[in-house]
């Protein structure tokens, strides 16, 4: 159980907006204050102010070490998953998060279910969830400090299973193949499909979504989620049933571009080196770049690529709804210094 004494809580409240490095150098004059834990909380709250505003608004929340804060979902991406699950899961009685972590996604998704199971191997993170759950109004959760494979074997039928496999190996190095993530969802695939109608996998945006769809052979929707034009998450909706719309959805803030999953990337791609003066140059956002279906982009928005391998597009027409950045073409020049 996570406990902070009154002196430590007072120190956190009094110095919440101060520079953590300066506080560490200053130290404290009393042994009543757990300074390392206090600094962790101050740093966590400062990150949560922008990343997790609803958590930051609750004084009793206890935060994990900085690395966990950096790696956790933002409130924006967690809410996106919540909306996705509400569309796909018409019945929302039971859910299980088999890789609980800090619990941002779990606590967001659990709000819409009658019962939710949080599974996490790290005892410290389990203790944090035991403390933060009631603060967040979650009184219907079961916390299990166990390995997910063992829990999955004994788990009753669920309406939703959520998993966020770790994208680092035992040495802390990044991995970029689905089979290298832990837990290995490929080896658990059959059990997962038997245990839940909907399985939502959160993966690194660095993974090749085409390869993941091929390997799993049960993906019904793909969601590439970016915020601020930076890809944050790759979400795969899996099921043994024909649920969902079969699309790849590229999302960046309010921009959304979807296309059928089976679309060949460059089918319909139109190219031209002709540039219209006073026309417009278009650059797709990061999510669309990751999606890679530029032929569909040409068809939907009537743009042409500057080259077969170019990711810049032109059109004589201004399109406010293009999923990316727009520029008016004022002049055209070669790389000749005198022309420039």
Region spans (language model):
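SAM-dependent transferase fold signal centered on methyltransferase-like domains
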Residues: 1-340
């Amino acid at each position: 159980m996570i406990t902070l004494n009154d002196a430590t809580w007072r120190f956190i409240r009094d110095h919440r907006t101060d520079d953590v490095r300066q506080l560490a150098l200053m130290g404290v004059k009393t042994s009543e204050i757990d300074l390392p834990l206090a600094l962790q909380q101050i740093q966590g709250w400062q990150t949560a102010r922008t990343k997790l505003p609803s958590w930051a608004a609750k004084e009793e929340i206890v935060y994990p070490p900085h690395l966990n804060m950096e790696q956790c979902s933002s409130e924006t991406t967690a809410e996106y998953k919540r909306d996705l699950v509400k569309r796909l899961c018409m019945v929302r009685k039971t859910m299980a998060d088999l890789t609980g972590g800090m619990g941002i996604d779990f606590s967001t998704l659990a709000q819409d279910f009658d019962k939710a199971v949080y599974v996490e191997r790290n005892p410290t993170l389990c203790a944090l969830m035991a403390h933060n759950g009631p603060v967040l109004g979650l009184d219907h959760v079961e916390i299990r400090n166990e390995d997910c494979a063992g829990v999955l074997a004994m788990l009753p039928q669920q309406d939703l299973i959520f998993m966020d496999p770790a994208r680092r190996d035992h040495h802390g190095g990044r991995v970029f193949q689905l089979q290298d993530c832990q837990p290995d969802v490929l080896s658990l695939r059959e059990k997962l499909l038997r245990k839940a109608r909907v399985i939502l996998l959160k993966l690194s945006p660095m993974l090749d979504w085409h390869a993941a769809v091929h390997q799993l052979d049960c993906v019904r929707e793909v969601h590439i989620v970016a915020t601020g034009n930076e890809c944050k998450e790759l979400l795969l909706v899996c099921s043994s049933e024909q649920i969902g719309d079969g699309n790849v959805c590229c999302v960046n803030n309010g921009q959304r571009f979807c296309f059928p999953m089976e679309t060949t990337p460059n089918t319909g791609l139109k190219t031209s080196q002709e540039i219209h003066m006073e026309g417009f140059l278009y650059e797709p956002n990061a999510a669309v770049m990751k999606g890679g279906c530029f032929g569909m982009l040409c068809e939907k928005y009537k743009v042409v690529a500057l080259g077969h391998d170019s990711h810049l597009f032109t059109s004589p027409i201004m399109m406010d709804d293009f999923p990316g950045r727009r520029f008016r073409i004022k002049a055209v020049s070669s790389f000749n210094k005198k022309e420039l």
